Amino acid sequence: AVCGPRTTVGLEPSIAALRAGSQLALANKESVVAGGHLLFGAQVRDDQINPVDSEHSAIWQSLRSGTHAEVSRLVVTASGGPFRGWKRADMSDITPEQALNHPTWHMGPVVTINSSTLMNKGLEVIEASRLFDVAPDRIVVTVHPQSIVHSMVEFVDGATVCQASPPDMRLPIALGLSAPDRLGDVAAACDWTHASEWTFEPLDDEAFPAVALARECLRASEKHTAVLNAANEQAVHAFLDHRLPYLGIVDTVKEVVDAMDGELRGNPLFASVEEMGQVEREARRRADDLINSQK
């Protein structure tokens, strides 16, 4: 089975596929972010989920080099998006047209905006933590503008194992469908006959606070990460509709998370998909109220 819708509507069909014993090629990070507990609880065996996101596929492949106990850190790579190197003070007048111009990937508008704010990377940190059972503080984000190294695993002996290839989603999709086997001639490999440069830079959390916010929500609870995701979707749509400034995207999400924090801390896990939907709707409503108040 393949699950690829962009929002949490993919959760229920994914749960049904897992309960039926199907192998699931998962390209729907929102299901893990908002309802990972429900998703993983539907598995009838431990190896049912094949991650399709390029970063998680890379980690999944790299983890074959050691045991879980030997993993020191996961290193998630980010291209940096169209505003890599910008400071927060430079971002107030960014337009949707500018933010939709991603330097590496051609994606839908919401994912492209998420990539520009690095909220997409924050969601990927949440997904990696839950998929691979690694604590939030043991997941690092590094900016790698060439997008050749798709993510890495650092082991306790100091070795770092990565998966590298030219950016092409056919590769993780094919592996997600064929694993544990590999198909032949899926995509081009790296060209070792020409000089190339791979660079890695630290993430600027002041300019791009979305990853730190996602990490805070991950530490707090599954309900917090569901609110993060739902509020972000509303804020991104408002930005694309010219109803919210660029910096207002992550600021709005943080305000919603902070406002709902107290009511989310009772029971950290959702009892059902229906409860998740209720919390998501409330997060969207609050985000809309904040957005409308800024007009």
Regions found by a protein language model. Give the residues of each.
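Catalytic, metal-anchored helix/loop core of enzyme active sites in primary metabolism
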Residues: 1-295
